[in-house]
Design a protein with these regions (language model features):
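Terminal, non-globular segments
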Residues: 1-161
Length: 161
């Protein structure tokens, strides 16, 4: 029991650390700035693939903090995280833990695409600015590549226990 409490604390610290890493944007060219989306990867993996590792209140706090660090209107990320997580858990509930690498990647692609479309749409409506599609697509594909590596490591780590 004590080992699982420490593991849960370590995972929350990892999620907080990845949320802080989203401050360090990746600049490809002068006008293309990308977010690594590491916090989204950890939130997805430990709420949808491994159900209920992170409670909803923790995801809400991570979303608020992520918005504040990135200068986005506070609350949009939290709202979208919680709605999408509840929706994905509802449709994926019969298969509580996903240990299949392929299905894990497919679900992440679907989750990330819906999240980026909704977040970009809400921000475009709220700020009145139009966000460039190629920025979103590059961020999307880079995030999928990073998640494939991160997911394989996390799946291997969870199978060993």
């Amino acid at each position: 029991m004590q080992k699982s409490i420490y593991k849960n604390i370590y995972l929350k610290i990892l999620a907080i650390f990845f949320t802080m890493l989203n401050i360090a944007n990746i600049y490809i060219f002068d006008n293309i700035r990308l977010f690594p989306n590491l916090d989204i990867m950890i939130i997805f993996f430990f709420t949808i693939c491994k159900i209920r590792v992170f409670p909803i209140w923790f995801i809400f706090i991570l979303g608020i903090w992520s918005d504040a660090l990135n200068g986005i209107n506070i609350g949009i990320s939290s709202l979208l995280y919680i709605i999408l997580i509840k929706l994905f858990i509802f449709f994926n509930y019969p298969e509580k833990n996903i240990n299949d690498f392929g299905k894990n990647i497919i679900l992440f692609v679907l989750f990330l695409s819906i999240l980026l479309i909704l977040k970009t749409g809400f921000l475009s409506i709220y700020t009145g600015k139009i966000y460039y599609l190629y920025h979103i697509l590059i961020e999307f594909f880079i995030s999928i590549g990073i998640y494939a590596i991160l997911s394989s490591i996390l799946l291997k780590y969870n199978r060993e226990e």
